[in-house]
Amino acid sequence: MMLPQNSWHIDFGRCCCHQNLFSAVVTCILLLNSCFLISSFNGTDLELRLVNGDGPCSGTVEVKFQGQWGTVCDDGWNTTASTVVCKQLGCPFSFAMFRFGQAVTRHGKIWLDDVSCYGNESALWECQHREWGSHNCYHGEDVGVNCYGEANLGLRLVDGNNSCSGRVEVKFQERWGTICDDGWNLNTAAVVCRQLGCPSSFISSGVVNSPAVLRPIWLDDILCQGNELALWNCRHRGWGNHDCSHNEDVTLTCYDSSDLELRLVGGTNRCMGRVELKIQGRWGTVCHHKWNNAAADVVCKQLGCGTALHFAGLPHLQSGSDVVWLDGVSCSGNESFLWDCRHSGTVNFDCLHQNDVSVICSDGADLELRLADGSNNCSGRVEVRIHEQWWTICDQNWKNEQALVVCKQLGCPFSVFGSRRAKPSNEARDIWINSISCTGNESALWDCTYDGKAKRTCFRRSDAGVICSDKADLDLRLVGAHSPCYGRLEVKYQGEWGTVCHDRWSTRNAAVVCKQLGCGKPLHVFGMTYFKEASGPIWLDDVSCIGNESNIWDCEHSGWGKHNCVHREDVIVTCSGDATWGLRLVGGSNRCSGRLEVYFQGRWGTVCDDGWNSKAAAVVCSQLDCPSSIIGMGLGNASTGYGKIWLDDVSCDGDESDLWSCRNSGWGNNDCSHSEDVGVICSDASDMELRLVGGSSRCAGKVEVNVQGAVGILCANGWGMNIAEVVCRQLECGSAIRVSREPHFTERTLHILMSNSGCTGGEASLWDCIRWEWKQTACHLNMEASLICSAHRQPRLVGADMPCSGRVEVKHADTWRSVCDSDFSLHAANVLCRELNCGDAISLSVGDHFGKGNGLTWAEKFQCEGSETHLALCPIVQHPEDTCIHSREVGVVCSRYTDVRLVNGKSQCDGQVEINVLGHWGSLCDTHWDPEDARVLCRQLSCGTALSTTGGKYIGERSVRVWGHRFHCLGNESLLDNCQMTVLGAPPCIHGNTVSVICTGSLTQPLFPCLANVSDPYLSAVPEGSALICLEDKRLRLVDGDSRCAGRVEIYHDGFWGTICDDGWDLSDAHVVCQKLGCGVAFNATVSAHFGEGSGPIWLDDLNCTGMESHLWQCPSRGWGQHDCRHKEDAGVICSEFTALRLYSETETESCAGRLEVFYNGTWGSVGRRNITTAIAGIVCRQLGCGENGVVSLAPLSKTGSGFMWVDDIQCPKTHISIWQCLSAPWERRISSPAEETWITCEDRIRVRGGDTECSGRVEIWHAGSWGTVCDDSWDLAEAEVVCQQLGCGSALAALRDASFGQGTGTIWLDDMRCKGNESFLWDCHAKPWGQSDCGHKEDAGVRCSGQSLKSLNASSGHLALILSSIFGLLLLVLFILFLTWCRVQKQKHLPLRVSTRRRGSLEENLFHEMETCLKREDPHGTRTSDDTPNHGCEDASDTSLLGVLPASEATK
């Protein structure tokens, strides 16, 4: 129907009205306003559909927005988004496959791009995406989705012997297809067997012999973990995507244990032979690849044949035939059946039968041992009979321990035995084994360990031989000189004397000889004979003693009579005879520590440290019968020696019985001074203490060991989880959850080096499994051992501008969680504040005062008593996780200076100011105390406002300490802790210059009341030596500078802050400002708004100070508010106490790595490295905006120093936010070298580059002194969310890959990121170690963030909707009033307004009548217009009665 000519029609989207009555106008106004409000809250008509597919559950994805259908781009699309689509449309979504929509050429809108879903959304548009209609795609990238339920998929095994064997086929899209064997393994096969309800005790898998050529290949590169419920839940290429042929189709058989059988064949009994396995009636062999002794043990145990002998080579057995069933078998030894072991699959066609495995079990051994071709039954070549055949043993690694076992097994005398090389056998077959290892305690040779396989070859083709003898047959002597303790060494063997060749002769050999002859110690060790050459046999050669042998023939040698020497190589030995020897440690804390001294030739002398090591120290401790659990090297507290240096270049093996048995340069031969004297500390566990230091709790940090008062940090060499487990257990800190290597920075720290770690992780104490070595130098690569134990609870306060207030969060196992108010008491708050070095708790809060947390809440109730030093030490009570809502999270406000008081006054509200710092009370210096500080102090003490503050001895002194802390309060703070504070470089303050305060809450009046008409606050009435500062309404400050002592000058006067004009502004004027603010002298009087233009009044102009005034307003000027300036002429000042901070590098432009320098007194100078820690480095980096952490290092060799140093000995807790708050030595300019200066490299800074906004681009990280990128492997919205939140850029809209913002440069720092999305920093997520990646820059990751925080976004969007709707309603109301006015004018001209004369109507009635008259028009024919107005597809409001608005027919009621 046509719209009448005189009808009113308003259309706003779907909301429109057309009425000609007053009520209709009001209805339209309210309806349109409501509709706008609804539209503001996204109440749009959004729809979703799939088109051009096989049905409503497949096809191209289309979204209806603003009445128009459009497609979705495939950028960022994944199966999670497909699942959301299927779920929203009510389609089956147990499997949702996405496809591209390029098969159909489309036109029109592309509504969505970069869609990223979590999977729990109820509609597609609730996922993250670009703005509607914003994209960089074409329709060839339209995304499509196919939704499938379980009913659409199937799995079966076909063409096998039964339903549990055959070719693997999968049903997809109503069609059965095969699976390619690429990536197929036993985990995947196990999923198939379990899904089909088939047994899975043993699984045989391979490829088919008869491929299914007419079927599709559905899956390829399938990878299962083994615990999936269905095969299609495993990772794969995608349905129908493959690069295979049907010759690669997978087949498998699922076996029950009843289908399997094991045997040993080819031996003399059932417990020895070739290993064979029967599967479904067919016997096959096992390939030796990866076979080990544990596998052999499993075979013997399964067959009830005892245990496996520790050799498996049976070269005489006939090889197997038929199939090789198993390959790559690897057992732990605990398995009950061989098929329970891990293996690489069945039917191996690459393994030949010559590699078949054989086993001999202990219950089936048919073995015999003999010595052949010797002088008797107890000497000769070693031979072993196996299966009626004699075999020899290769002499490779053959030693006396093996010979001892042979002698004992044959029942031969073994008080003396020797090993030898035997001549080849004419009877025995080939070498049976070529490497056997015995301890000497075995009862039979086959109880020794061996290398596991038969050997057919032997290096140099030498058989092992043995000579077993009795001690009565042997003797020893030294001949050719006039002393029985000096001469040529001779040995009697088989009734004949013979010599010993010098090959391999050593000090230990000589020590055994001297000890055996009762001749003391060896004096001269090396050298061949210069006596008359002997005759007769050379019995021994290549003698090698350990040093603890009783006889020289007990040492290893080449065999009796086996040598390659002549008699001029005979050994001579010189022993000490009756000489007296001695050893001691002097100058230490006890007899087992100190400087090492040796007594020789009647004199004590020292030992030089050339070549000295822990083995030599161990010999000393053992010789002195001192404990040796931990051995320290170095003098420690002992001084250097004097006199003779007896030994040098000492080299021990560690098992010598005394120090002089070790190799050395000879008595008295050295090239040393006493500065190189050796020191030794011998200790055991009773002298040792273990703790963790430098962490945020007692269960985290670096490993520190205290030995007899000497403290050292454990070096990180060999550091790992096995050692960390022992540390955590010993400290009662649970188990280790993280180990790390941290750099060392302090020169004076001793170190402990792990020279031998045998920790398995199950030991009760670290001393049970580690051999130690003291080091007075740095660790290898300067890295120290650090760890975090499971009992570690690291707290923090977040959500506030100050580090000592905020929402309580506790970190455990890399996750931060908020704490519920019911789980946290005031006692716990006090413990937390003390742990954070934040003083005491002054308040607890509940709710979102400090913002709401995210993720799960803490699942423990802290039951602190209040006296604990760390929150982790409080008793806890577990409760179910996430039982607390985020609106019940607890917040804490701490104050370091809650311990503040006024003492020595008339009441608690007047007196000398004292604060407690680090547990010590002290007064404050009055040098930088001002009225604003006094106001805050009185407010904090609930003592009203400050009346006056005094300097000197106005009230008196009693404090021992005078602290140098300088508070810079504005006057409106509630606590001193909220004021800016500096202490760095503060000079000592002498007594008599301390500050006192009188507050209005005092019970007494000020002794010297201030005079209102005196502008100078320093009154002459104050006693000499004191100064009374009256508090007035004039204040001074510097703003917009880089520190409190530089900036634009502003004065508080008459209730407003204002500026000063630069007319006549000079150093004299600026000097008054600097002195008033305690900022030294003026360096620069800046003009022309150098620090930016101010606002408010310009209070002073044409100042003309002499520089001696106490206040700026005492200088001559035009008068308050009198000027001819603008703010572009605002004056500023830079004072000598102006400080700045930087990291300076001579070659690098990046300001986040280099020498730490401070600007003071007009020049840059360095900072001393004494006491600089990683915590201080972190404060510097955060203060400079260079990241969260820093690494301190020594000066690079190529760098030069600054030449002088400004400050040193900085001490700072990690909770400070500025280095200016740290304690230090006073400011002092002194010459310094690069080695004395601090060098810092900041870490863990993040930025985005290459994007179109500051919140989008390629992700880059500053680490190890350079910028690098992040690889996009596993990059997703969770990782992007962490980046966006860390940058303060709101929430993540998209996680972009493939260098979407261009390729970066430098190192790719992080790869394989795994974030939860609630981490504070990207590097808190799990990832590969720093710098380890397999990516190129074409894979650089990027992000696109919303640009504002979620909180502000949500708040602003709701408020914006309300504001806009209200404005729109008011606008319509104004238009309505204007319309009424126009109607009145028109009626006065044409149709005079008629009002009922019978009774006065209400205003509403008159307005209604006027509207009705005005709106109802007659057409040219005089007929009334119709109300039949077409609705144009919108919702007609003609019959709508809104609440509070009556229809016209009811208006007069």
UniProtKB/Swiss-Prot annotation:
TM region(s), chain numbering: 1360-1380
Disulfide bond annotation, renumbered to this chain: C73-C137, C86-C147, C117-C127, C180-C244, C193-C254, C224-C234, C287-C351, C300-C361, C331-C341, C394-C458, C407-C468, C438-C448, C501-C565, C514-C575, C545-C555, C608-C672, C621-C682, C652-C662, C715-C779, C728-C789, C759-C769, C820-C884, C833-C894, C864-C874, C925-C989, C938-C999, C969-C979, C1061-C1125, C1074-C1135, C1105-C1115, C1181-C1242, C1212-C1222, C1271-C1335, C1284-C1345, C1315-C1325
Record bears the keyword Repressor: no
Region Disordered, annotated ranges: 1418-1453
Signal peptide: 1-40
Bias-annotated ranges (Basic and acidic residues): 1418-1435
Residue ranges constituting the SRCR domain according to the UniProt record: 48-148, 155-255, 262-362, 369-469, 476-576, 583-683, 690-790, 795-895, 900-1000, 1036-1136, 1141-1243, 1246-1346
Protein name (database record): Scavenger receptor cysteine-rich type 1 protein M160
Species of provenance: Homo sapiens (Human)
